[in-house]
Amino acid sequence: MAAMSLLQRASVSALTALSCRRAGPRLGVGSFLTRSFPKTVAPVRHSGDHGKRLFVVKPSLYYDARFLRLMKFYLMLTGIPVIIGITLVNIFIGEAELAEIPEGYIPEHWEYYKHPISRWIARNFYDGPEKNYEKTLAILQIESEKAELRLKEQEVRRLMRARGDGPWYQFPTPEKEFIDHSPKATPDN
């Protein structure tokens, strides 16, 4: 495309130069040596759109499209069966109804939920409130024992300082192997 435009421009300029030389000063165009012949007008093509087309460097959309395609696939793969399962549970099982509790019967913690899916989740994945209560009591007992031990340690340190029987009044003695008993030239060696 560019070669064709260049070829056309060269041919137009050559024809103009030849025609100006032949016409001479009669047309008032000027002489061939002064290079005053008219400018050539060649069409500039921009591929049919508005303005010059630029080569814009942009990142590839391959990974974005692949991610969206896979996300749609896996949503459909998991979403459709889940919707079908929830619909079947709502149609055939339905929500629980409130009834009188028989004498001496202690309901389980999941029996307080109305919907069967909530009951199933509470029964299989969550701990009961009694178990949570016992866990909290165990944590509180451990923390209270730690606090008591800290208080006892502070009291022991205070008494050791007051009576002077702490480790700061003792100096570590060197081991017997480190003592050099060989004769020395001066006492400080």
From Swiss-Prot:
Keyword Membrane: yes
Protein family: Belongs to the complex I NDUFB5 subunit family.
Species name: Mus musculus (Mouse)
GO biological process, one term: aerobic respiration
Transit peptide start and end: 1-46
Key words, A-Z: Electron transport, Membrane, Mitochondrion, Mitochondrion inner membrane, Respiratory chain, Transit peptide, Transmembrane, Transmembrane helix, Transport
Subunit comment: Complex I is composed of 45 different subunits.
TM ranges: 73-93
Membrane topology: Single-pass membrane protein
Function, in words: Accessory subunit of the mitochondrial membrane respiratory chain NADH dehydrogenase (Complex I), that is believed not to be involved in catalysis. Complex I functions in the transfer of electrons from NADH to the respiratory chain. The immediate electron acceptor for the enzyme is believed to be ubiquinone.
Source species taxonomy: Eukaryota, Metazoa, Chordata, Craniata, Vertebrata
Protein name per Swiss-Prot or TrEMBL: NADH dehydrogenase [ubiquinone] 1 beta subcomplex subunit 5, mitochondrial
Signal peptide coordinates: none
InterPro entries assigned: NADH_UbQ_OxRdtase_B5_su
Compartment(s): Mitochondrion inner membrane
One GO location term (cellular component): mitochondrial inner membrane
